[in-house]
Amino acid sequence: SFLCWGYFVPKFSKNVNDAIRLLRIGAPLNLIILALIIYLGPKAGSIHWALFIVSSIFLSLIQPAVGMAFSLKNAGKSLTSFNLLIFIGAFFIQWIIGIIIDIGMSFNYSEINSFKFAMLFVLITSLSSYLFFLKKINKLF
């Protein structure tokens, strides 16, 4: 998907507004697939997870949009800060997922339900972030 994305993004996304439009349209697809995976539980197969991963590609539009939102003088600093934020956020989310699974199991929930709780946390935080994004861009445009 990254190979195709690398080919098509320059054709679709020429500025920040294009990236925001694509993100606005594409991000819900990822959330819908994650909700389906949570609903299916152990019946969700590798095809569902592959679709989830491929649909996450829309989130990669954020980084170039951050770079384009700043002047050339400040673009490098903004991208470095953004990369640090992504790095810290990824580890934080992984840590929280593990804690939720451990807590679920300590309350005698099954391993499957504990994983569902953790993925539900990811869905809720992702949906909250997406709604916050929509609220902010509607104020800007």
Language-model features: locations:
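A late C-terminal transmembrane helix in Major Facilitator Superfamily
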Residues: 2, 72-106
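Helix-to-loop junctions at the C-terminal end of transmembrane segments
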Residues: 2-17, 101
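Paired intracellular helix-loop junctions of major facilitator superfamily
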Residues: 13-14, 67-76
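A membrane-interface helix-boundary motif in multi-pass transporters
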Residues: 19, 99-124
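C-terminal transmembrane helical hairpin of 12-TM major facilitator-type secondary transporters
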Residues: 19-62
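Multi-pass alpha-helical transporter architecture, strongest
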Residues: 37-40, 117-141
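Interfacial helix-capping/hinge residues at the ends of transmembrane alpha-helices
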Residues: 63-64, 97
